[in-house]
Amino acid sequence: MKIRLLLALAGSALGFAVLILAGLPTASRAAEAPATASAGEMVPGFNHQGLERLHEGLRAFVDSGQYAGTVSLLLREGQVADAYAYGMRDLENKLPMGRDTICRLYSLSKIVSTVAALTLVEQGKLDLGDPVENYLPQLANRQVMVGGTADAPKLQPASHPFTLRELMTHTAGFIYGGSPAAISEVWERAHLWDSKSLSEFVDRLAPLPLVHDPGTTFEYSVSIDVLGAVVEKVSGQPFEQVLRERIFEPLGMKDTGFSVEPAKRDRLAKTYKPGADGRLVEAAPLIGVVPEGTGAWPGAGLFSTIDDFARFAQMLCDNGTANGHRILSRKTVDLMMANQLYELPLKYNTFRPNNQADGFGLGGEVRIEAGGDRLGSVGDYGWYSAATGFCKVNRKEKLVALCFTEHFTGKAQPLDWHFVRVFANLYNQALE
C-alpha cells in the first residue's frame, strides 16, 4: 500500500473544510481554534451521519472546557476516511491542534519498540523464549518480594528467569508503581528515571525485587524499557538508531523520534490537566519526556504526529508491509496480535479492571471477546497513551483508528478511560 498516497495532508484532494469558530466564551478557550474535517463520505465503509456524531462527540470534550484539543484520523482500506482536528495544542498562545501537531506518544511508544525487537527475532538474533539474562547478565538470579517492608523485604527466588516474551506481555514481574506500598517504595528509591542511558537504567533495576513470579501475572511495567536495552545490546546500535533504520526511514516517519528538532518545536502540543478550580492548566511531562530529549525511553519516550503514527499503524494493518518495504512478516504480525495470556486465570488476563473482552498480545492489547464496555471487533489490536492517546488496528475491517489529545486526568491514572470508551464507540458506530 502506498502510504504517501494514503496520508495526503489537509488541503489536498480530500477537500478539507475549515470552520472558523468565533465569539465563544472564555471558558471554552480551546474551542476558539478552527476545526478541520475531511469529507468522510468519499471513502466507502463509513456513514456520514456516524462521522458527524464522532465530530460532535469530540467537540463536546473541548467546548465543555474538559480538553484543550483533539486530533483524530480514521483509515479504511488504506485511505483516509476521516480526519478531524478541533481545539488548541497551545491554549496560552492560541495555536490550533492539527495533523502536523507533534505529540508525546508515551506508552504508544511500546508498540513501536516491540516491533523493533521482533525484527531481530525474525533475523534469528533473538528468540521469544530466551531468558533475558542471556543478554543482560546483571538481571540474573531474580528475587520476588513476597512480604516484609521496604527496609526489610521478605524475598524468595523466582521460579525461572524471565523471558523476552514475558517482557513483551508485561508478565516478567516488574512494576511501574501503584503496586503494594512496600515494593513501590523499594523501586522509588532506585530513581530509575534519572538514568542517562538504558544501560544505566538496567544497572539501577538489577538489585530491585520482582512483584510477581515471572509468567504468573500481568503487571503493567517497565518491561519494554528492559526490552529496549536488549535490542541495544544485540544490535550493537543506540536504540533510536535501530528505530530510525528499521521503522522510521522505511515508513517515511520524518516527525518521529525521542526528541524534537528546534525548528519543529513550534508544532509541539502542550499537555493539559484540570487545575484546582477545574480549568485546564499546563501539565509537566512524565519521566522527563521533553523536546530536548533526555534519553531513548522505549516504553514512553517517542514524539510523533498523527500522520506519522498512522504510517506505522497502517503497516501493521497491511500485515507488516508499507511502501514496498516489509518491516515484519505476516505471521509475526499474526503472533503479535494474538492473545498471549491464555494460560493465566481470567482476573490476570486483562489490563483494565473488570474488562474480560481484552487480552494482551506482544506489546499491545488485543480484543478476544465481542462483549465488554465498548464497541469493537475481535482481533482489534493497539494501545494507549498516558496523555489519553488511542491507537487501534483492525485487520478484519481494514481499519486504523487514532486519536491524540495530550490530556491528563490529573489523577493517579493519567489516562482518561471515559474518553477512550466514547471515542471507540463513536468511530465504530460510524462503520457501515
Regions found by a protein language model. Give the residues of each.
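Positively charged n-region of N-terminal signal peptides that target proteins for export
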Residues: 1-4
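Bacterial N-terminal signal peptides
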Residues: 10-23
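Signal peptide processing junction and immediate N-terminal pro/mature segment
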Residues: 20-34
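Acidic/histidine-rich, surface-exposed loop or edge segments in extracytoplasmic proteins
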Residues: 33-42
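Short, conserved catalytic-motif segment at the N-terminal edge
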Residues: 42-105, 125-127, 141-148, 285, ...
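Active-site SXXK
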Residues: 52-59, 78, 102-132, 140, ...
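Short, surface-exposed loop or secondary-structure junction motifs
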Residues: 90, 142-378
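Structured C-terminal helix/loop/strand segments within mature extracytoplasmic catalytic/sensor domains
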Residues: 382-432
